[in-house]
């Protein structure tokens, strides 16, 4: 199964979670091609913690002999959600433009059966998973890989941003050298003129 479809399977399971309409993703971690099986991962969706402001969810699905995992932290923003202004973007960032259209969003919401009202109507925001999927599609990491995303500010549908690819630093080089299972570590920021929308770290592993 193509890994984009594997992501959608994991994300669609989250849509079955009750009482989280209007909530937002604070952070998530995908792990595709994980062969280490735990008894606790037999259940497709586990609620590790949930109260009125925060929920931690563990999701598991299978692609043949490989296991895919998704750990998500959701937050209830209440009335505190703020969006950046719509100022023009810096022209020098055009090589890495990032924008999610209304059509893309509607198609994604249908695929995962997401009815969260924050993705509908005027001022609707892009689903966090959809941003993650677009970034992963652009990078095309090889399975097995792990991808961590931390969402800092909502991005409105049809608003442009850009991807900033951080060069490999000494810390990453030492990490790869120390852990022989690692093949590549890539860090990315999604930005607008006013905000950092998300921070991502994608780690590829040797098979």
Regions found by a protein language model. Give the residues of each.
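A broadly conserved detector of short glycine/acidic/proline-rich loop/turn motifs that flank catalytic sites
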Residues: 102-104, 155
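Generic alpha-helix signal with a bias toward terminal, lower-confidence helices
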Residues: 112, 137, 161-163, 167
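HotDog/MaoC-like acyl-thioester-processing domains
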Residues: 1-12, 19-97, 155-157, 164-207
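Catalytic-pocket segment enriched in acidic/His residues
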Residues: 129-149, 154-157, 168
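A conserved, well-ordered hydrophobic junction motif at loop->secondary-structure transitions
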Residues: 1-25, 97, 104-140
């Amino acid at each position: 199964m193509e890994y984009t479809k594997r992501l959608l399977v994991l994300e669609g399971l989250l849509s079955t979670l009750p009482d989280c309409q209007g909530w937002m993703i604070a952070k998530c971690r995908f792990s595709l091609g994980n062969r280490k099986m735990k008894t606790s991962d037999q259940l497709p969706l586990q609620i590790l913690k949930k109260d009125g402001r925060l929920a931690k969810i563990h999701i598991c699905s299978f692609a043949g002999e490989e296991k895919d995992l998704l750990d998500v932290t959701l937050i209830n923003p209440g009335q505190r959600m703020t969006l950046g202004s719509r100022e023009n973007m810096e022209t020098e960032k055009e090589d890495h433009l990032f924008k999610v259209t209304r059509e893309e969003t509607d198609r994604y919401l249908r695929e995962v059966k997401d009815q969260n009202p924050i993705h509908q109507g005027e001022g609707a925001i892009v689903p966090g998973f959809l941003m993650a999927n677009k970034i992963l599609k652009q990078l095309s990491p090889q399975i097995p890989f792990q991808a961590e995303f931390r969402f800092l500010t909502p991005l409105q549908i049809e608003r442009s941003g850009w991807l900033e690819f951080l060069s490999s630093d000494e810390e990453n080089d030492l990490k790869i050298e120390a852990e022989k299972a690692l093949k590549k570590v890539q860090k990315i920021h999604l930005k607008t003129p006013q905000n950092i929308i998300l921070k991502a770290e994608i780690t590829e592993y040797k098979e």
